Amino acid sequence: MALNEQDVARIARLARIELTPDQRGRAQAELNGILHLIERLQAVDTQGVEPLAHPLSAHEDITLRLREDAVSEQATEASRAELLANAPESADGLFLVPKVIE
């Protein structure tokens, strides 16, 4: 799959970036290169290959070090009030934040 100039213009519009004709041409070449690489990766037979949790784990002895969740300090009503005093807005012991999803 190759992108044409109209595809790149549409992507730029959706991303809300303005591209000059020269930049559009370079972006088209770069995006087509990325798509070509993705096509090559999809063509590789990975049947029977164990997934990696970390990209270097195949070459080095890397294990994920997990720890138990533990309370590091006990919250008191005074410490909670002190923390909430730093908040621009709070109600009923909770931080109030602006709505971010419309």
Curated annotation (Swiss-Prot):
Lipid metabolism as a keyword of this entry, yes or no, is no
The Gene Ontology terms for molecular function here are: asparaginyl-tRNA synthase (glutamine-hydrolyzing) activity; ATP binding; glutaminyl-tRNA synthase (glutamine-hydrolyzing) activity
User: Which reactions does this protein catalyse?
Assistant: L-glutamyl-tRNA(Gln) + L-glutamine + ATP + H2O = L-glutaminyl-tRNA(Gln) + L-glutamate + ADP + phosphate + H(+); L-aspartyl-tRNA(Asn) + L-glutamine + ATP + H2O = L-asparaginyl-tRNA(Asn) + L-glutamate + ADP + phosphate + 2 H(+)
Keywords on this record? ATP-binding, Ligase, Nucleotide-binding, Protein biosynthesis
Q: Does the keyword Ligase apply?
A: yes
InterPro entries tied to this protein: Asp/Glu-ADT_sf_sub_c (IPR036113), GatC (IPR003837)
Q: Which Gene3D superfamilies match?
A: Glu-tRNAGln amidotransferase C subunit, N-terminal domain
**In Gene Ontology terms, what is a biological process of this protein?**
translation
- What Enzyme Commission number does this protein have? 6.3.5.-
Pfam families per the record? GatC
Stated family: Belongs to the GatC family.
This protein's assembly is summarised as: Heterotrimer of A, B and C subunits.
The protein's job, in short, is: Allows the formation of correctly charged Asn-tRNA(Asn) or Gln-tRNA(Gln) through the transamidation of misacylated Asp-tRNA(Asn) or Glu-tRNA(Gln) in organisms which lack either or both of asparaginyl-tRNA or glutaminyl-tRNA synthetases. The reaction takes place in the presence of glutamine and ATP through an activated phospho-Asp-tRNA(Asn) or phospho-Glu-tRNA(Gln).
> What is the official name of this protein in its record?
Aspartyl/glutamyl-tRNA(Asn/Gln) amidotransferase subunit C
Q: Identify the species of origin.
A: Bordetella bronchiseptica (strain ATCC BAA-588 / NCTC 13252 / RB50) (Alcaligenes bronchisepticus)
| Gene encoding the protein | gatC
